[in-house]
Amino acid sequence: MRALLSVSDKEGIVEFGKELENLGFEILSTGGTFKLLKENGVKVIEVSDFTKSPELFEGRVKTLHPKIHGGILHKRNDENHIKQAKENEILGIDLVCVNLYPFKKTTIMSDDFDEIIENIDIGGPAMIRSAAKNYKDVMVLCDRLDYEKVIETLKKNQNDENFRLSLMIKAYEYTANYDAYIANYMNERFNGGFGASKFIVGQKVFDTKYGENPHQKGALYEFDAFFSANFKALKGEASFNNLTDINAALNLASSFDKAPAIAIVKHGNSCGFAIKENLVQSYIHALKSDSVSAYGGVVAINGTLDEALANKINEIYVEVIIAANVDEKALAVFEGKKRIKIFTQESPFLIRSFDKYDFKHIDGGFVYQNSDEADEDELKNAKLMSQREASKEELKDLEIAMKIAAFTKSNNVVYVKNGAMVAIGMGMTSRIDAAKAATFKAKEMGLDLQGCVLASEAFFPFRDSIDEASKVGVKAIVEPGGSIRDDEVVKAADEYGMALYFTGVRHFLH
């Protein structure tokens, strides 16, 4: 038996090589891997000695040789292949262990394009693909986490076709991921991120019980190990719908730096939000916005879920809590609640990945765009359109309302008072309907909107929403502006003594 080991990530390779040697494998290797194995007492043959061909062009050509690829690719049960191998002095290679040059790591650490180009692996992917293609005869490894499993399988003589098939699939996933990153990087560098092809690659974290509905399959995939590093289940398992709601709630609650923010979300839309002096007060005021919709919802906590907050949340049924951190006493509060699910990021405050791009599936393809972000500078740089200026407290509320609006389905309007959302209308086909739905709900919940502020994610096409806002005592408004009737909107704001700001930035969300 013969194995070829050539790795960039050398962790565990010496131990793996020794185990293979003990199992009777002849070891072939290249470059730094060869040197490391030899220094650590592994009997190893350099590939250039095996092929009788030197490494060429500063190591660019090492393993691209018929004796390597022929040794990997020829079928062991095909008489013609065996004959050709013998005629050409090609010896079988039965195990290929390769991981690739660190292209991604290089792009993160350096902008030197020559250095980046040199870290595009050529021989490695070729060997992995060859070994994967001939998986019926050859084992292929590209992940050091598989070393122990492979040794155990070989020792137990369980190296069957199904096991090699699983390694083959993993190998093609690995090379596809590698090439996809290279293509995306080149398009990012030279085509502004929007090249002729776009590759979206994620790693599976776990399967969900089902998808959006019970008849659909579902799973969570991640970019750059984000969930593996920042998502821990403390109680229960996340469903597909839980994950989309967690995403919406976490994005909003984490948008105010270290502020004690609480967001409550149902079906992807905010039904409660507040920033008060502490998390308990934030939760109390967030819940007031719509305690009916909060039932069975998702609560995001930008801080620690402690016993006091847990007791308050436990007064109603919520399905999911996602908190930056959770203490043991808080967990104990929910011991008797079988259906509640609790997740944490094990950090002082909630963490977002801040993905640079966003995409949505449409029938036959997907649309792809730069990610949207409601920055606080939008309000700082907004243009005052009215005669009246907003007070300092109103400006704080406007920032909250503006960010909630940016994370809410269009058309929407958001009312905020004293750091808490007091009304919201979302997902409506007309903005005036959103405004009316919000104030109707607030009245139903017994909330006093007098003195609140208002934000909209897009411009008001008519003055009717301003007229509606005046009925509940809105004092300040922020919106993008850009309507052909902006002058009517400004006039209405002045009539009612409202402060009105145009940001110039729209935040449609569909």
Swiss-Prot record:
Pfam families: AICARFT_IMPCHas, MGS. Pathway: Purine metabolism; IMP biosynthesis via de novo pathway; 5-formamido-1-(5-phospho-D-ribosyl)imidazole-4-carboxamide from 5-amino-1-(5-phospho-D-ribosyl)imidazole-4-carboxamide (10-formyl THF route): step 1/1; Purine metabolism; IMP biosynthesis via de novo pathway; IMP from 5-formamido-1-(5-phospho-D-ribosyl)imidazole-4-carboxamide: step 1/1. One of its GO terms (cellular component) is cytosol. Residues 1-142 form the MGS-like domain. Its EC number is 2.1.2.3, 3.5.4.10. It catalyses: (6R)-10-formyltetrahydrofolate + 5-amino-1-(5-phospho-beta-D-ribosyl)imidazole-4-carboxamide = 5-formamido-1-(5-phospho-D-ribosyl)imidazole-4-carboxamide + (6S)-5,6,7,8-tetrahydrofolate; IMP + H2O = 5-formamido-1-(5-phospho-D-ribosyl)imidazole-4-carboxamide. The keyword Transferase applies. Belongs to the PurH family. PANTHER family: BIFUNCTIONAL PURINE BIOSYNTHESIS PROTEIN ATIC (PTHR11692:SF0), BIFUNCTIONAL PURINE BIOSYNTHESIS PROTEIN PURH (PTHR11692). The IMP cyclohydrolase activity resides in the N-terminal region. This is Bifunctional purine biosynthesis protein PurH. It comes from Campylobacter jejuni subsp. doylei (strain ATCC BAA-1458 / RM4099 / 269.97). The lineage of its organism: Bacteria, Pseudomonadati, Campylobacterota, Epsilonproteobacteria, Campylobacterales. The gene is purH.
